[in-house]
């Protein structure tokens, strides 16, 4: 997919990667807002620098077990770190372990020792290590010997690598905002983390893209009320080439989103009336304040809609809104 203008986000992340490590960075935002695309662009633009990127895209795998985690993160080799064969075009690395390393009888301390060895090897080579994990929350339900949570222990390791030893940047990407809320409230990560939002595309950016792609001023003005995510622009451009007007494409989007929301509500055991009551808060405005407009007894309905990606909870700024502008229009139509 074509990379669209994200200079502000690119500059922030490129600069962050070149600073001395001092915190864990959580990059969050609505689903499909372009987090992974921006991060991959950062890696490409810094490929000639002295940075060694360890990049793990966990969205490629449906479920995770202890064994799968080890297979994804490590590779047997004489080297302490080596190119990731699954991401050769990106030039990123994996942690290396010796050929006779026994994956079947591992303790968590053994795993962390190998991660530390790889990172220290990069530093000894005069380079800067940056560890990036995309959709980190997929590791939530993995436990090692003694019932230790992999994710909780990883956070302790990340704090050590960044805040304490200043050895390695750790950047975690996620669209799971309930997961971000857990992290934000965690005492373990207090004063050790930064949060960066990659949100909807700005209207000026959308206008420039559509103009560059040959859309008329009338078409652009119509689209600006509905577009917010990069993939929507791609879909709009493709559909125009296939003979669909922008009005037809956008109407299709809203109808599909409306049906998805209705089906979700129709098939849950939660109180239908209460769910619609929560959605009605968005009838006349696209975002609400969590502090001022969400009651305690409504939280389970909000969490259900957030978990199912109808709503997006920006925990850092205390805002709840639909995951996209087209989703907002679908909500409003359902409420008619």
UniProtKB/Swiss-Prot annotation:
CDD domains: AAA (cd00009)
Alphabetized Pfam families for the sequence: ATPase_2, MJ1010-like_2nd
Transmembrane segments: none
Residues that hold ATP according to the record: 29-36
Keyword annotations from UniProtKB, A to Z: ATP-binding, Nucleotide-binding
InterPro entries attached to this UniProt entry: AAA+_ATPase, Archaeal_ATPase_domain, ATPase_dom, MJ1010-like_2nd, P-loop_NTPase, WH-like_DNA-bd_sf
GO molecular function: ATP binding; ATP hydrolysis activity
SUPFAM superfamilies per UniProt: P-loop containing nucleoside triphosphate hydrolases (SSF52540)
Family: Belongs to the archaeal ATPase family.
Official protein name in the record: Uncharacterized ATP-binding protein MJ0625
Origin species: Methanocaldococcus jannaschii (strain ATCC 43067 / DSM 2661 / JAL-1 / JCM 10045 / NBRC 100440)
């Amino acid at each position: 997919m074509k990379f669209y203008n994200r200079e502000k986000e690119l500059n922030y992340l490129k600069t962050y990667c070149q600073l001395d490590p001092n915190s864990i960075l959580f990059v969050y935002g609505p689903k499909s807002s372009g987090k992974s695309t921006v991060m991959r662009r950062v890696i490409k633009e810094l490929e000639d620098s002295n940075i060694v990127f360890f990049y793990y895209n966990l969205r490629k795998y449906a479920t995770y077990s202890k064994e799968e985690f080890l297979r994804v993160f490590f590779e047997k080799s004489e080297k302490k770190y080596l190119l990731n064969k699954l991401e050769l075009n990106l030039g990123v690395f994996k942690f290396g372990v010796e050929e006779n390393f026994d994956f079947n009888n591992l303790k968590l301390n053994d795993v962390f020792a190998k991660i530390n060895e790889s990172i220290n090897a990069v530093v000894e080579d005069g380079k800067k290590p940056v560890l990036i994990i995309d959709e980190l929350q997929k590791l939530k339900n993995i436990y090692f010997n003694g019932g230790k949570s992999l994710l909780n222990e990883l956070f302790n390791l990340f704090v050590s690598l960044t805040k304490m030893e200043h050895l390695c940047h750790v950047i975690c990407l996620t669209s799971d905002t309930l997961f971000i809320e857990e992290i934000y409230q965690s005492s373990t990560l207090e004063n050790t983390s930064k949060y960066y939002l990659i949100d909807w595309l700005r209207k000026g950016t959308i206008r420039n893209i559509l103009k560059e792609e040959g859309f008329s001023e009338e078409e652009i003005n119509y689209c600006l009320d509905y577009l917010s995510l990069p993939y929507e622009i791609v879909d709009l451009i493709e559909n125009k080439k296939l003979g669909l007007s922008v009005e037809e494409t956008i109407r299709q989007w809203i109808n599909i989103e409306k049906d998805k929301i209705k089906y979700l509500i129709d098939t849950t055991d939660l109180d239908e009336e209460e769910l619609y009551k929560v959605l009605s808060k968005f009838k006349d405005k696209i975002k609400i304040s969590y502090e001022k407009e969400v009651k305690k007894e409504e939280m389970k309905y909000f969490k259900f809609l957030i978990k199912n990606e109808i709503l997006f909870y920006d925990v850092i700024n205390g805002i709840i809104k639909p995951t996209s502008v087209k989703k907002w229009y679908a909500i409003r139509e359902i409420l008619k």
